[in-house]
């Protein structure tokens, strides 16, 4: 008999559920689970996976750990088998716990490390730079703070209520805004990353650069000097991505910005040129424009060219209304930088003439941070772009090496990374979890915002799905009318015949606040009629989803306010 200690059970019914789960694990002959004792006595076959046992319990929301090892004379003892599987103490430490190496400290890495510890593993987390990764330090958090500040500046300068509230030209104190922004970044980094790691004795943090020696060992070049070899039972690669820089002649010899430098700039340039039409490019372009810069965007195609064409058209129109110059189908063939008496000047050569600017932001996408990992020593498969190829369980081509987040071929969103990290940890500790991205919401924080989930019409047709779609302009949404801001639309894509909702695209102020409702509707396979029949609070933007659903069989212009 082997014993598991179980915490988290609250009644005898919990014990029944745990018993059922354990007896479904291959190799378990019987399980006697006691809520009062907080334990499970197991009759198991030799070779039964201890990871599978703890994962089965964890899947119910409880925590299981192995009790003391049985006597040496007992053949097939669970802890003995575990040590045989995982190696001796020189590899896993005196605790005998599964040892997981995590490379990185961003959203995927943190989620994985914490979940792995919860599952009973011991973690070594390796970070070459600042703890926290891209999102909190140089991505989501500082950019959204800057975007919000720019939005406030814009409203003071211009709003739909200028007839009754006098507009004014705001004074922008960029250094003060930057100090406020970075203080919040520091606060969140400590509260959500550094402090959590420091307080968890099962996680060891190494500050240095990791590379693979082989598929069982890492070499860590420590930041304070020296090297350390880290042997592991499982490894998670969560190294994120960095700004990609296009091979434009002359560009590398200039002091161009990526988003990293732009977010911590102490000044707002008079003239800003932006190469790229990525999400980052568009969000920062509008923010800088609202803070006082004259902004010109060079887009290789159109804005949002991969999305429904109406999205790009709506955002382009909004940008041009604010004085942002959008040059579509325009690329820089040469970039030069001319040093002046005080400040230099960028000169961009295009097929349509020269563009001169005080600063240049290059935001053409992000490339996975995999080049310096020596992955050729492991056999891990990469895409031609250097992204790690993974399956829905975050497994790479090497059985015990996993990957999650922006360094993989998954969508580059921090919430996707965190969800992937959690599932990777479950799988590394013997579980079987997959990440389903069929109803993944995405938001672009321009104004109006862009929010999407599920299929666009073109994507559905590409996959052989016949569709029926409706588009509701915001002049039919009471909240937008009350705001005196009817820019944008909500579009629903429905599977023809079944009436099932399969996609939503929205361009609207605060569109991000409505898209999760759409995601839940898609995930739960709701029909458009079922969505139309739901109760939505009046004078909210999300009510637009109901109204858009009603357009499939009604003329909403003929409905009274909040008509059900």
UniProtKB/Swiss-Prot annotation:
Question: What is the required cofactor set for this protein?
Answer: FAD
What GO terms in the biological process aspect are recorded for it? detoxification of mercury ion
Q: Where does FAD bind?
A: 109, 129, 134, 144, 210, 406, 414
- The answer, when asked if Metal-binding is one of the entry's keywords, is yes
Pfam families membership: HMA, Pyr_redox_2, Pyr_redox_dim
Where in this chain does the record put each HMA domain? 1-65
| Top-level taxonomic group | Bacteria
Record note on cofactor: Binds 1 FAD per subunit.
Keywords, A to Z, come to: Disulfide bond, FAD, Flavoprotein, Mercuric resistance, Mercury, Metal-binding, NADP, Oxidoreductase, Plasmid, Redox-active center, Transposable element
Q: Which reaction does it catalyse?
A: Hg + NADP(+) + H(+) = Hg(2+) + NADPH
Q: Where does Hg(2+) bind?
A: 561-562
Q: List the disulfide bonds.
A: 135-140
Residues given in the record as a metal cation binding sites: 11, 14
EC identifiers of the protein: 1.16.1.1
Q: Which family does it belong to?
A: Belongs to the class-I pyridine nucleotide-disulfide oxidoreductase family.
Query: What's the miscellaneous note?
Result: The active site is a redox-active disulfide bond.
Q: What does this protein do?
A: Resistance to Hg(2+) in bacteria appears to be governed by a specialized system which includes mercuric reductase. MerA protein is responsible for volatilizing mercury as Hg(0).
Its subunit composition reads: Homodimer.
Q: What is this protein called?
A: Mercuric reductase
What is the native source organism of this protein?
Shigella flexneri
